[in-house]
């Protein structure tokens, strides 16, 4: 039983990377760490490129993964980025890691800056996120579908996607 007059104090969830970003003037919102204990940070699409560039300059030199997911009908489309500091480490030391998340209103502007200029490995990962969720990556050199046919309508991994009854494959000849 709880007393209504008790003040609930939330546990501080910011970690060293979020604190470093805040101390250097980068807007961010720390989220609860993931199941592996890795720091998760929410950032705005407008700050993505500058924050990732700052993190890369601070040693996060490898984009392990970029992807997206749909929180559900009427909710956000989320782009996530897993960055790692790849250095030669002693056997008992783990590399620094961080997870960045950009939350996009599904009915708003689904545009984020491409990280291709910083990490060439973002190429096909961003194209897959575009292909499956409809997120546009501004500045991407090859902004076209990767998995679905070029004339496909819609974004198949969105939870509000309605699958067509019939799709006629076009003969390449």
UniProtKB/Swiss-Prot annotation:
It is a peripheral membrane protein. One of its GO terms (cellular component) is plasma membrane-derived thylakoid membrane. Its EC number is 7.1.1.-. InterPro entries: NADH_DH_suC, NADH_quin_OxRdtase_su_C/D-like, NADH_UbQ_OxRdtase_30kDa_su, NADH_UbQ_OxRdtase_CS. It is an enzyme of class 7 (translocase). It catalyses: a plastoquinone + NADH + (n+1) H(+)(in) = a plastoquinol + NAD(+) + n H(+)(out); a plastoquinone + NADPH + (n+1) H(+)(in) = a plastoquinol + NADP(+) + n H(+)(out). SUPFAM superfamilies: Nqo5-like. Its main location: membrane. The keyword Ribonucleoprotein does not apply. One of its GO terms (molecular function) is quinone binding. It is found in: Cellular thylakoid membrane. It comes from the Bacteria. GO terms for biological process: photosynthesis, light reaction. Pfam families: Complex1_30kDa. NDH-1 shuttles electrons from an unknown electron donor, via FMN and iron-sulfur (Fe-S) centers, to quinones in the respiratory and/or the photosynthetic chain. The immediate electron acceptor for the enzyme in this species is believed to be plastoquinone. Couples the redox reaction to proton translocation, and thus conserves the redox energy in a proton gradient. Cyanobacterial NDH-1 also plays a role in inorganic carbon-concentration. Belongs to the complex I 30 kDa subunit family. NDH-1 can be composed of about 15 different subunits; different subcomplexes with different compositions have been identified which probably have different functions. This is NAD(P)H-quinone oxidoreductase subunit J.
């Amino acid at each position: 039983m709880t007393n209504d007059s008790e003040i609930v104090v939330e546990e501080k969830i910011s970690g060293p990377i979020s604190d470093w970003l805040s101390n250097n003037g980068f807007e961010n919102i720390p989220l609860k760490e993931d199941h592996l204990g890795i720091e998760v940070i929410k950032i705005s699409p407008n700050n993505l490129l500058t924050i990732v560039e700052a993190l890369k300059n601070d040693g996060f030199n490898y984009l392990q993964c970029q992807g997206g997911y749909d929180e559900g009908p009427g909710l956000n489309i989320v782009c996530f980025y897993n960055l790692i500091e790849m250095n030669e480490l002693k056997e008992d030391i783990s590399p620094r890691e961080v997870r960045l998340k950009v939350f996009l209103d599904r009915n708003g502007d689904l545009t984020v800056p491409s990280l291709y200029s910083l990490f060439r490995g973002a190429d096909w990962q961003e194209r897959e996120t575009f292909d499956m969720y409809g997120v546009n990556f501004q500045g991407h050199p090859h902004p076209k579908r990767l998995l679905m046919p070029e004339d496909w309508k819609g974004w198949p991994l969105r939870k509000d996607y309605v699958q067509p009854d019939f799709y006629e494959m076009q003969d390449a000849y």
